[in-house]
């Protein structure tokens, strides 16, 4: 082999190693930033101090929830993780599962849980895998979580064989609910669902965030991140696909989104609504940012949610 050819091959291999090393670094950085449940998420959410009034209101809602006939319940899922939920006991057979969002936890949904309890529901509020008191190290973006919601539905039926169940989720919880709606194992006792500001898929959401936060295209950064996620978390980001799931759903669904949402962009709700099989309704809340629809116009929000659920339970 000529010396010049060897030099060219050597340079090419060196560049390939550098590129692969860079992609490996980028993939691991993304995994740590977005999927590792224990890492700092301030790059995504910023370091703004929370409004003291909002913090106090959240504490008050939690205390109100725990002052009801509320207990901690536990379930071991098919992957061996011990999962936690709050269960608000009441009379009757009308149940609702309330699902929190990304890096949140069950206790942060206390305001919603209290509302449904006041409407006569028996309420189950799970900590999703790797959140709150539930075990796990990686955030599932709905891929795993939707399977856990199916199992929580079966848990309810063990407590109450005559149960009629609704699903309600916000943000990642909304996408989890949508993914669960298309799961063939979802019990027939689940009658209706409400999704508030869910994303079409984890892939689409992270593509948006890569561009919004870093000005990067999805290829090759997200492909590298997905490779690392498959290695370290054991799932493919493309499996967290709410858009594919709603095409197969067999239950009515109310889609809600704020028209000022710049975290899960409002444009995501339209293909979800269009693709959804079966009975469906769409509510766009003017001026509402991500997860803020019920704060911007609480009367209209709860009137719509309650009336929609009431048609099927």
Question: Where is each model-derived feature located?
Answer:
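Short beta-strand/loop motif that positions the catalytic acidic residue
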Residues: 248-250, 255-257, 261
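Catalytic active-site module of serine/aspartate enzymes centered on a nucleophile-bearing elbow/loop
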Residues: 296-313
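Hydrolase active-site cap/lid region
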Residues: 179-235
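An N-terminal hydrophobic leader/cap segment in hydrolases
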Residues: 18-76
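Conserved alpha/beta-hydrolase
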Residues: 113-135
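Catalytic histidine neighborhood in serine/cysteine hydrolases
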Residues: 273-291
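The serine-hydrolase catalytic nucleophile loop
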Residues: 102-115
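Alpha/beta-hydrolase active-site loop
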Residues: 139-160
């Amino acid at each position: 082999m000529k010396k010049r050819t060897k030099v060219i091959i050597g340079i090419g291999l060196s560049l390939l190693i550098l590129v692969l090393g860079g992609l490996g670094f980028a993939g691991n950085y993304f995994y740590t930033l977005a999927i590792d449940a224990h890492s700092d998420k301030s790059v995504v959410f910023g370091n703004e101090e929370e409004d003291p009034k909002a913090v106090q209101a959240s504490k008050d809602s939690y205390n109100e929830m725990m002052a009801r006939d509320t207990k901690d319940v536990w379930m071991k899922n098919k992957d061996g993780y011990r999962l936690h939920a709050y269960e608000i006991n009441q009379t009757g057979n009308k149940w609702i599962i309330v699902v929190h969002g990304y890096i949140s936890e069950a206790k942060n949904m206390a305001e919603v849980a209290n509302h449904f309890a006041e409407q006569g529901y028996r309420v189950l509020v799970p900590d999703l895998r790797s959140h709150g008191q539930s075990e796990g190290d990686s955030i599932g973006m709905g891929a795993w979580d939707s399977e856990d919601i199916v199992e929580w539905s079966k848990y309810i039926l063990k407590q109450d064989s005559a149960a009629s169940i609704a699903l309600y989720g916000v943000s990642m919880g909304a996408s989890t609910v949508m993914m669960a709606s298309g799961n063939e194992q979802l019990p027939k006792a689940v009658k209706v669902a409400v999704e508030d500001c869910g994303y079409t898929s984890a892939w689409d959401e992270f593509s948006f965030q890569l561009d919004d936060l870093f000005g990067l295209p999805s290829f090759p950064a997200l492909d590298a991140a997905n490779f690392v996620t498959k290695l370290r978390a054991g799932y493919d980001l493309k499996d967290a696909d709410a858009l594919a799931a709603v095409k197969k759903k067999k239950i009515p669904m109310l889609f809600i989104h704020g028209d000022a949402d710049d975290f899960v962009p409002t444009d995501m709700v339209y293909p979800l609504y269009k693709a959804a099989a079966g009975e469906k309704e769409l509510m766009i809340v003017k001026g509402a940012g991500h997860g803020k629809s019920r704060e911007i116009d609480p009367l209209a929000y709860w009137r719509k949610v309650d009336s929609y659920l009431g048609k099927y339970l």
